[in-house]
């Protein structure tokens, strides 16, 4: 049984203006609401929907920065939560030509001591789940080393 998934999605740091937020609402069954606390909340049917929505927002940021001749800078996470987002970004790269050539990425953590090629390394996780599938330049990838 699928349960609705909700989470706070912020436009802070995405570079999306009001016009962009209107144009990129994502799947039609997404419900968007601003509570009394003014925290923008999005409720979707399942994790695949939220992964697509987040990936669409990241893609819009990348495309907008590319159009302005700027570099898109992404802070990325590891673990099971972002895997669906990374899969959708890979699909957008392969099927729709989303380019990561002008993207710089940062991850915040790594185990210590941990060699980058260790099966538990966040460095390895990012290369296996995103970087090796898109055209990001290796020199633009910043994952702390634990060795």
Regions found by a protein language model. Give the residues of each.
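Ligand-binding beta-strand-loop-alpha-helix segment within the catalytic cores
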Residues: 31-38, 98-147
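Glycine-rich N-terminal segment of FAD-binding domains in flavoprotein oxidoreductases
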Residues: 63-95
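Generic structural signal for well-ordered alpha-helical scaffold segments
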Residues: 55-63, 90, 94, 127-131
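A short glycine/serine-rich beta->alpha loop
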Residues: 43-44, 74, 111-116
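N-terminal glycine-/serine-/threonine-rich phosphate-binding loop
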Residues: 2-4, 9, 20-73
């Amino acid at each position: 049984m699928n349960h609705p998934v909700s989470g706070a999605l912020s436009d802070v740091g995405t570079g999306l203006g009001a016009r962009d937020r209107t144009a990129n609402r994502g799947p039609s069954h997404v419900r968007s609401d601003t509570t009394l606390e003014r925290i923008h909340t999005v409720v979707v049917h399942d994790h695949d929907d939220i992964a697509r929505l987040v990936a669409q927002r990241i893609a819009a940021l990348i495309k907008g920065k590319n159009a302005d001749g700027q570099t898109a800078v992404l802070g990325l996470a590891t673990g099971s939560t972002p895997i669906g987002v990374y899969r959708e970004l890979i699909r957008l790269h392969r099927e729709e030509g989303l380019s990561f050539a002008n993207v710089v990425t940062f991850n915040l953590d790594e185990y210590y001591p941990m060699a980058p090629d260790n099966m538990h390394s966040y460095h390895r996780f990012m290369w296996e789940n995103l970087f090796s599938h898109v055209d990001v330049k290796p020199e633009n990838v910043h994952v702390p080393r634990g060795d």
